[in-house]
């Protein structure tokens, strides 16, 4: 076991929802800080809020984190209620709501939303959810944020109140300036899927926006790296699943090539992100072998 100087979480594989309880219980028994789960609509993955609710009930200390939940695909009021419910039921210190906009047109078509306006919609959603989490009704929302609620204006408030005042901890993912600024406008921190060589600049930009907006303290900085650890069949499984997941981007081969598959590579990445000031590093697993949890535990 190595002291890597930062908290380390596990990103859960999406290929077999029934196996996630095993992963969660092993991670809880180990040194890991957080369970993370990605989001897609038109894909064979579990719905993250439902799955993480089950995992939270099967564990007692480990955080549960969406990374990232595609908020623009969802009804805003219902999402606010779901997140507040899970935050309340886990004591206000275990849910981390990682949010992003997504880039798949088929996800947006299935949800009946517009890919082209997804960033603006997320900002509008945050304006509403923050109000709802503070116990305010719909009154006045829509007067300046571009949202239209028709007959819903004046309805509410919508409970339950979250255990954490103002709502669960919110992280934003993304790479563009608008996404990084969103951290300072609405969030508590940043979730980066970039390698350390790139993430340092993103972290600095987020810190700059944080100061520009007059926010107290420092933004929480979370990094994500894709890993697989085990015999050749485990590595082959992870590579195949990663390639299928990223095929739509045209960069599947590049993503697979960046998969970290040795203890030395993973330790180096953990140290690099700790040196950049990351508060946590998520080790994201695509392969289904749950023994990876124990192998990774030996590194952290």
Q: Where are the regions a protein language model picked out?
A:
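Active-site-adjacent structural elements that line small-molecule/cofactor binding pockets in enzymes
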Residues: 1-300
